[in-house]
Regions:
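Oxyanion/phosphate-interacting regions
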Residues: 1-16, 22, 183-187, 202-273
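N-terminal subdomain of lithium-sensitive/metallo-dependent phosphomonoesterases centered on the IMPase/IPPase/PAP
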Residues: 1-92, 113, 179, 183-186, ...
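Residue-level signal for inorganic ion chemistry
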Residues: 25, 48, 59, 95, ...
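Short, hydrophobic alpha-helical packing/hinge segments within bilobed ligand-binding/sensory domains
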Residues: 51, 107, 201-202, 227
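Glycine-rich active-site/cofactor-binding loop and its immediate structural neighborhood
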Residues: 83-125
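Acidic beta-strand-loop-alpha-helix segment within the catalytic core
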Residues: 109-203, 246, 252-273
Length: 273
C-alpha cells in the first residue's frame, strides 16, 4: 500500500487532534457529565459530542477534501458520501467505561484508503497513553502524552511479539464478552486472558503484551479502524471470517466478527458474523 505525499502531515494532524480531543474528554471525566441515550439505546455523553467537535474542526483544517465518518455525526443522520478515501472517528470509544469511571476509554481517529486503514491513532487520556501507526511505512509507536502538559512525550517504536511457546495471552472486551468468544478461545493455546475496554485491546497486541483479540460480537467501523491501523503497522493482522482481511466502507459501517492477532495465524472464523 503506497504512501501519499500528504500522509505525514495528516498523520501528525490526527495525532494532535486525538491529544486535543483527549484533553476535552479528560476534563469532563474529572468533572461532571450528563448521560443520554441514542436511538439504538447506546449511551452518549457531553464528552462524546465535545471531543467530536474538536476532531472534526482539526481534520477539516488539514484535509478539507477528505470526507469524515464520525460516530455522533452518523447518529444525527449526517453521513457524507465517501469514495476511496475517508476518515473514521470515534470520539469516545468505551463510553461505558467512561461512565463507570474506569480509565480504559479512548479517542480513535483513522484514515481509510481503498477499504483498509492506512493511518490510525488511539489515545487513552486517563492513562496518558497514545498509540499510532502508519501502515504504508510499517511504523508504529507509543508515547505517554500527559493531557495536563504541553510537552510532547518521546515516541517508542512498538512491535508485535513472536508466538510464545508457553501459551497465548488473549485479550477480550470488558463490557461485551460472549459465549462465542469463550468457545473460540477454547480452540487456542491460551495461558492467560486479559479483559480491557475500548481499542486498547488492539494496542495490547500491537505492543506485544498480548497475542490474540477475538471479537465475536457487534462492532462498528469507527470502533476498530484506528486500532486496526496501529496493529497492522506494528506487524499484526486483523482477519474477517474465512481468513480474509477485515475491510471498511461497508454500506452500514457495521463490521463482521473478526480476529486480531500478532504473529500468530489464528484459527479461521466460519460464517459472516
Amino acid at each position: 500500500m503506497s504512501e501519499k505525499p500528504e500522509d505525514t502531515e495528516i498523520f501528525e494532524a490526527i495525532v494532535a487532534a486525538a491529544i486535543e480531543a483527549g484533553k476535552v474528554v479528560h476534563d469532563i471525566y474529572r468533572g461532571g457529565f450528563d448521560v443520554q441515550r441514542k436511538a439504538d439505546a447506546s449511551p452518549v455523553t457531553d464528552a462524546d459530542n465535545a471531543a467530536e467537535a474538536v476532531i472534526l474542526k482539526r481534520l477539516r483544517e488539514v484535509a478539507p477534501h477528505i470526507p469524515i465518518i464520525a460516530e455522533e455525526e452518523v447518529a444525527a443522520g449526517r453521513v457524507p458520501a465517501i469514495a476511496d478515501e475517508f476518515f473514521l472517528v470515534d470520539p469516545l470509544d468505551g463510553t461505558k467505561e467512561f461512565i463507570q469511571k474506569r480509565g480504559d476509554f479512548t479517542v480513535n481517529i483513522a484514515l481509510i484508503r481503498d477499504r483498509s486503514p492506512v493511518l490510525g491513532v488511539v489515545y487513552a487520556p486517563a492513562k496518558s497513553s497514545l498509540f499510532a501507526g502508519n501502515v504504508s511505512t510499517r511504523t508504529a509507536f507509543r508515547s505517554d502524552e500527559n493531557t495536563d502538559s504541553s510537552q510532547t512525550a518521546p515516541r517508542r517504536t512498538i512491535k508485535v511479539r513472536p508466538v510464545p511457546a508457553d501459551g497465548l495471552i488473549a485479550v477480550s472486551s470488558r463490557s461485551h464478552s460472549t459465549p462465542e468468544t469463550d468457545a473460540y478461545l477454547a480452540q487456542c493455546n491460551v495461558s492467560d486472558r486479559v479483559s480491557i475496554g475500548s481499542s486498547l485491546k488492539f494496542c495490547l497486541v500491537a505492543t506485544g503484551e498480548a497475542d490474540l483479540y477475538p471479537r465475536l460480537g457487534p462492532t462498528m467501523e469507527w470502533d476498530t479502524a484506528a486500532g486496526h491501523a496501529v496493529l497492522v503497522a506494528a506487524g499484526g493482522s486483523v482477519y474477517a471470517p474465512g481468513g480474509v482481511p477485515l475491510l471498511y466502507a461497508k454500506p452500514t459501517f457495521r463490521n463482521s466478527y473478526f480476529i486480531a492477532s500478532g504473529t500468530l495465524i489464528p484459527p479461521a472464523l466460519s460464517g459472516r458474523g
